[in-house]
Amino acid sequence: MSIKTLISVLRVTLLTACLLPSLFFVRSAIAGPYIWEVVMYSSSGSSTPAEACEKARVVADRSPDWNYTSATPKMNGLDNSYCSVVYVSRRDPSVVNTCDDCASWKLFRKGDQCANADDTYNASTGICEPPPKECKEGELFPAKGPDSPVVTSGGRNYVGDGGAPTACYQSCEYGGNPSPASCYLVKGSTTTGFCNYILKGTGQSCGADSYTFSQTGDSLNPPDTPNTDPSDPNDPGCPPGWSWSGTTCVKTPTDPTDPTDPTTPGGDGGGDGNGGGNNNGGGNDGGTGNGDGSGGGDGNGAGDGSGDGDGSGTGGDGNGTCDPAKENCSTGPEGPGGELKEPTPGTWDDAIATWEKKVEEAKKELKTKVKANVDQMKGAFDLNLAEGGGQLPCESMTIWGKSYSLCISDYAGQLSSLRVALLLMAALIAALILLKD
């Protein structure tokens, strides 16, 4: 081999040796989503540092000598981030070790962008964060209050928690001052309890999430205890839009098969003729209802259905003929037609006029009967004080040798007043008798 050939081979070898690392570097820097890995654990690749540390911990925990109890990310930029690990000796559990910067637990990142183009990379956490959620005011959120002492009063148990908590869920703030939705004893305790509350969204965003979903515990009071908060072990009082999972309230998942707009689902609107024939003219324009057409058509398909399938259920109109000798050509009883109209308002005028007439007749009848009774009683009680030549009688008599005179004229004024009083009493008595009947 000539010296020139040897030099050429050496040049190629050196060039390859120089290019290989750069090829690996380019591969790690090619376009793709961010992936975090732990140096000594290639299977730990994840979208977040925390997930990568946990995957590596699971693998490391297979060690016969050490029990790796935790591995959490300790972020300090791309070149100086580690998984902080805690591991315990399996032979002697009292031996506990920690390491915040072990070389074998160093984190590194691959890729050059977030998997979701709308996300924003947070350099301090190494996580791609989604855009802020629109926080809706009044949105309901089931939250567990703090564990608090149980107070007994009047034979009933109460939780002295001081009121509803606040919560930050998916960067939205929830609060308010609601009454407890349910209260329980902490499981296994008789002196400590908690209450669940239905908080409402304030419409404001918040920082780090801080919340605990509603949950259940042991019953705070017997079920039949009056004037106490609910304590059903199978229902903490999840609000609409949330469901009981058996341990806590969770968001009720939406059905992806349901259309967002129920007025525009896909489907074939078919029309079925009632004239014995089968109209097959289905309109594939997004109709929702199946309409029954009223057109006739023989059973052999002579009638060509023209169902429009527009979603209103009008169905197809059969254009065929029907033989009454062979088929029932009736289209069925005809339903009510027309449309609803505003009713004509009624009036009480006729009824009022009728009763006014009856009242007037009753007044006249009462007046006639009162007059008749007054005249009758007037004849019984009338004193004709003018009888005797325009002068009241004056009688003289002798008793035991003495003369006495009784002159009615001396009492003319009193008798006249008595006459008027008797007439008035007679009229009142007659009126009472008539009204009683």
UniProtKB/Swiss-Prot annotation:
It comes from the Viruses. Residues 1-31 form the signal peptide. It is a single-pass type I membrane protein. One of its GO terms (biological process) is virion attachment to host cell pilus. It is found in: Virion; Host membrane. Residues 218-235, 252-265 have a biased composition (Low complexity). Residues 266-319 have a biased composition (Gly residues). Belongs to the inovirus G3P protein family. Plays essential roles both in the penetration of the viral genome into the bacterial host via pilus retraction and in the extrusion process. During the initial step of infection, G3P mediates adsorption of the phage to its primary receptor, the tip of host type IV PAK pilus. Attachment of the phage causes pilus retraction bringing the viral particle into close proximity of the host cell inner membrane. Subsequent interaction with a secondary host entry receptor induces penetration of the viral DNA into the host cytoplasm. This is Attachment protein G3P. It comes from Pseudomonas phage Pf1 (Bacteriophage Pf1). The gene is III.
